[in-house]
Amino acid sequence: MRVFCAIELPEEVRGRLREHIERLRREVPDVAASWSRVENIHLTLKFFGNVARDEIAAISAAASQTVKEFSAFEIEVGGTGVFPRASRAQILWIGVNDPSGQLSALQRTLENECEAAGFPKEDRPYRPHLTIARLRKPEGARRLAKTHLGVQFNPMPVTVKEVIAFRSELSSKGSKYTAISHHQLSDPRKSPPQRGSSRGRGDAGGA
């Protein structure tokens, strides 16, 4: 089964993503694109790919160990972008801002815990974003990218309270994501700053 660890988005953010996608589809209807289902959009921390069932426990254990170092923190969802560039857009995304550096620290800690458990480490730098569409053909892609980049997507605060391990299953209706395990970050109102907090501030500049 395919497994990944991610952060769930609140309904108000999903609603804004839905509005943005519907606007793009309405204004640029003739572009071949695979649009993300809003209910499936998460902020991915680590994608494992296909794993055996007996490896699930190790993934959950790594996530549990990771969150011990962190209190709940805030990020922002906002801004628009494309990969690789507007003139040859292949992916449309909504940005994720990490003002405290805690998101980068959380992802890095999870990556290290998973590596210690025997899973390959991701070599590419972590660039948090929410994919809303993949463009299948170049025809019309530049026009869609220009429209996407021209729409203002004001920052929306999101409180990160937990890390969730999901499994992904393919069906005739597309991918279905099911939570395997939930891993709560501590409540900062009830506990002192933890090791992840101070470390995240110290090296946030490298994110």
Identify the role of each PLM range.
Residues 1-190, 195, 199, 205-207:
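Histidine-dependent nucleotide/RNA phosphoesterase domain, centered on the 2H-phosphoesterase fold
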